[in-house]
Amino acid sequence: MSPQTETKASVGFKAGVKDYKLTYYTPDYQTKDTDILAAFRVTPQPGVPPEEAGAAVAAESSTGTWTTVWTDGLTSLDRYKGRCYRIERVIGEKDQYIAYVAYPLDLFEEGSVTNMFTSIVGNVFGFKALRALRLEDLRIPTAYIKTFQGPPHGIQVERDKLNKYGRPLLGCTIKPKLGLSAKNYGRAVYECLRGGLDFTKDDENVNSQPFMRWRDRFLFCAEAIYKSQAETGEIKGHYLNATAGTCEEMMKRAIFARELGVPIVMHDYLTGGFTANTSLAHYCRDNGLLLHIHRAMHAVIDRQKNHGMHFRVLAKALRLSGGDHIHAGTVVGKLEGEREITLGFVDLLRDDFVEQDRSRGIYFTQDWVSLPGVLPVASGGIHVWHMPALTEIFGDDSVLQFGGGTLGHPWGNAPGAVANRVALEACVQARNEGRDLAREGNEIIRQACKWSPELAAACEVWKEIRFEFKPVDTLDPDGN
């Protein structure tokens, strides 16, 4: 290197380590409509000021590294850096803070949840200066949303395809989840659909194991769908799980499902990955398939209150990546889910515009512009006695999915489906007549039992079943 070059390059550069907050903590910053905004729950190590911790998150998830480097001078850090623009103490929690970070839109590839998450929830989550870090919420700007296709079809198009209106849809996960032969599996699908369900579902564990290869399962399930449709006059579906070990194999399964003429396929979007999910969602839109999404592995990421990522962020990411249904908890069943938090991300899945509401854990106003909505699926430990509460909590635009609550009926699978359909129809009728489902729910179900022996038998079996455990992930005392 010539002396002239060396002198020019060294202007304004000082080697060494400097505090993150000198560059990345900018409390006077005015956020832009095009910024991606993030709310992080930060627990700094002892001795680390919250401003330095928040700035470190902004730096390590955008342009920063642990030391100053020569190549900082070859770009405009002010244009590309993330900025921690506000810090709030979490009431009732020692050494926890909410750090708000703004990211310039140019940091992210268009239409790529994978790239967005690689930056925002990447290596920064292992940063030693932080004891724990959790991403509570994201504000996705409309300019970025418009680079995504989103759900293959959305709520209204799905209802039109199925010709089903004015009530929640009913589903059932086939059990036992593993071990059935393809023929016996198809028989269970047929019995449930014939009994009155709209959908049946592959368990998320079911891919293509030695006891039941995927092609055999697809064929027997298609036969069950067509037979039940012919007998009931209703459009039916089974969530055929296309999740596989490679994207190529996944697409092969989706293509075969389309060739069979079935209405819907399924994907495990977290274990399968966002790149695979987005590819499948694009295929489903182009070929008229609905796409059901299971969230297997979500609790590894979202259940602990101080570290990881809240499910509302995963729900937003799914709406961008693409899916027509996604499992969203039940509030009343066996799986984690506080009511206000659950309703918050259910609205983020379905609605076009959601206002900031800290009482429901929503940190930012979110405008989805023209992106279609996603049906939330309530599934896990629910039965006929839960039907009034589920109908009242989730409303019409939802899927209520009873696995054991259908297949565990003492008279068999079809009577289990009948019991659920009768319970749902009774709740919808009562609601439409102006009755209070929250207060009168049990009485509504008891009255329906008088003209449905199948429902009466189901009510007797599950009359004592409760899952009364306090959720781990709860709102903070101030509504955070």
UniProtKB/Swiss-Prot annotation:
Binding-site residues for Mg(2+), renumbered to this chain: 201, 203-204
Compartmental location: Plastid, Chloroplast
Family, similarity comment: Belongs to the RuBisCO large chain family. Type I subfamily.
Name recorded for this polypeptide: Ribulose bisphosphate carboxylase large chain
Source species of the chain: Ipomoea purpurea (Common morning glory)
Residues marked Transition state stabilizer (site): 334
Keyword Hydrolase attached: no
Additional facts recorded: The basic functional RuBisCO is composed of a large chain homodimer in a 'head-to-tail' conformation. In form I RuBisCO this homodimer is arranged in a barrel-like tetramer with the small subunits forming a tetrameric 'cap' on each end of the 'barrel'.
Cofactor note: Binds 1 Mg(2+) ion per subunit.
PROSITE patterns documented for this protein: RUBISCO_LARGE
In-chain residues carrying the UniProt-annotated modification N6-carboxylysine: 201
SUPFAM superfamilies, per the entry: RuBisCo, C-terminal domain, RuBisCO, large subunit, small (N-terminal) domain
Functional description taken from the UniProt entry: RuBisCO catalyzes two reactions: the carboxylation of D-ribulose 1,5-bisphosphate, the primary event in carbon dioxide fixation, as well as the oxidative fragmentation of the pentose substrate in the photorespiration process. Both reactions occur simultaneously and in competition at the same active site.
Entry keywords, A to Z: Acetylation, Calvin cycle, Carbon dioxide fixation, Chloroplast, Disulfide bond, Lyase, Magnesium, Metal-binding, Methylation, Monooxygenase, Oxidoreductase, Photorespiration, Photosynthesis, Plastid
Top-level enzyme category: lyase
Swiss-Prot/TrEMBL catalytic activity: 2 (2R)-3-phosphoglycerate + 2 H(+) = D-ribulose 1,5-bisphosphate + CO2 + H2O; D-ribulose 1,5-bisphosphate + O2 = 2-phosphoglycolate + (2R)-3-phosphoglycerate + 2 H(+)
Xref: InterPro entries: RuBisCO, RuBisCo_large_chain_AS, RuBisCO_lsu_C, RuBisCO_lsu_C_sf, RuBisCO_lsu_fd_N, RuBisCO_lsu_N_sf, RuBisCO_lsuI
Catalytic-site annotation from UniProt: 175, 294
A Pfam family hit: RuBisCO_large_N
